Amino acid sequence: KALAEKLHREMSTYRGVDLTENSRMTLGEWLDQWLEELVAPSVRESTLEGYRHHIQYHIKPRLGSKPISKITPDDVRKLYRDVQNHGRIREDPEYGHALSASSIRRLHGVFHLAMDAAVRDNLIARNPTEGVTLPRKTAVPKQILGDAQLERFLDVIREDDVWHDFFYTELTAGLRRGEICGLQWSDFDEAH
């Protein structure tokens, strides 16, 4: 009876789906094709490199040789668990060889897009990344300078015109470093 129910579920999954001959390709072959034919023409080079990194270092070594039609949500969960514990190539002082939750979320974003495209191209009936629980982001408590600490810090850097202006702007405007680095002189109003 359990086998019959499983068979019925599988049949209903594929009902109305006309899988193509390419359904036999491996996940690695699909990811290469997806990157070159569908992604590369429509994204910036830096985005493409980020996608390639996730695929080459995390997805393909673990699942690349498996037929795309055989990838299951359990495979995806195992992938995320494995990279969560052993995904970093070079050891990080804070994380060791583990990937952070936000890195796994970015990896999931890439994998999810690729598998959505496989569904649209009738390579698979459903996206196995759908509904997989992702690790929660760990909130790192922010260290905020007190008034006395802020005054001491500004006293120390006051002697250096470049750094004083940079940090004074950062601390008083509430901007992030990247936003400060992108400022132009035209962004400043000398009167105020």
Describe every region a protein language model picked out.
Residues I89-G109, R120-L183, E190-A191:
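Basic, Lys/Arg- and aromatic-enriched nucleic-acid-binding interface segment
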Residues Q56, H112-M115, V119:
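C-terminal flanking helix
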